[in-house]
Structures are given as structure tokens and as C-alpha cells.
Amino acid sequence: MAYDHTQSVKEVLRHVLFRCGLSETLDVVRHWRGHYTKHTRERDMTGIFSQIYANGAWVMRENQDSLSGVGSTQVATRELSTQLSDFLREVGCRRLVDIGCGDFNWMRSVEGDFDYVGIDVVPKVIEENAAHHGNGRRRFLCADATRQLSVTGDVALCREVLFHLSFKDGLSLLRNVRSASFRYVLFTTDNAVWFNSDIRSGDFRRINLRRSPYGLPAPLRELADDKVSKGRVLGVWPGTALPG
């Protein structure tokens, strides 16, 4: 996969603005473009992401079928759902823990004989998921996995979550997932960028998990997840590959 040098340079500039305390400059630009940015003023994870959902900050298209963003729509995830179903069957997954499950829109299409635990930091999202999708083998928990991860299983899925977290919060999440002793962990990574920028949690940028400060080894395999952004994949690592 060739690097996207233009995007990577943008990430360098984003990082410089963040380090200089000028991230609000980007908020002004986004506001001019019609994007909701008030969630960046919140100081805790629940407040940040509750504001995002309440105000449709991740709804970018008319008739979008997911509040969790364009990447969680059925159109964007049709092939990924099939790949993930095949992988879970192959490794004999008995419990899947979905960290940052969002509104459960695309995961409804993933098939397999496993128990499912969806975790998200937004209480209302979890309440609605439990009411509409919960059953004996599918449950939803409201928790902040950057602070503590109290459940474990065979496989942990954490799709596009790190893209929205600061270095500090992202690395804390990785350590908590490592401590939970999953056999396999799946994280979104973007092979097209060669520089990772730091951000305020709740913002967004593309990251390459093989680059600093994450420094993960090459994944065991990659599930194509590039319908929204070329170069994006869902990487599969052994749980022991994460920083402790």
C-alpha cells in the first residue's frame, strides 16, 4: 500500500497545532463548514460522546443509516461483515467483546455461534441497544474502557475507536485490552499514513498502529475496511502483541 503523503503531511500539521494548544483553530474551520464541534468542550468521555450522538455530529450524509458515522453504515461494511464472520468461525470464537460498539448498526450483519458483549461510553446508546437488540446471548454494557475493562472473551473488536482518542487515552485502552487476556484483538489501522497526530479525545484523525506512539508489530492478517478511506484495514493481532 503506497503512502498518502498529502494526508500524512496534514497529520503533521494537525499535531503541531495540538502541541501548540491551537486545536480550536480547526474547530473554527469545521464550524464554518457546517460541522458540530461543541462536544470538544466537554471534559469527560461520557460527555464528549453523548454530545456527538445527541447532535448527530457523525451524520454526514442524507438518509445515513447509522449515528455512529459513515463507516458504520451497511453499505460501508457489507464486505467487512462477511470477512469478520468468517474469521470468528475460523478461530472458534465463543465470546466477542466489541469495545466502542456504537449503535450496533453494522454488527447486526456479523454471523457466528458466539456470545456478544457490546461496550460503549454513552448511556443512551447502550440503553437503546439493549432494548432493541439485547437477548440471552447479546448484552450491552456502559463503560469507559480507557479507564477499566471488566469483561474478557476470546476476541476483542475495537473498530475505529482509537481514531477518536488522544495518545494518552488510546494507549490506556490498549493496556486495558492487553490486561484482559484476549486471544485475538482487532483494531482499525490505516496503512496509508506515515505520521500519527495527537488530538483531544472526541476529535478524529487517521492513525497507523505500526507507527509511534503505538508501535504494534505487523498484524497476523488484515480484513479490508476501505470503503470510506483507502488504506484502512481491520488488523488482527494476538492479544499479547499489545503494550502492557
Residue ranges and their predicted role:
Residues 161:
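Hydrophobic adenine-recognition pocket in adenosine-nucleotide-binding enzymes
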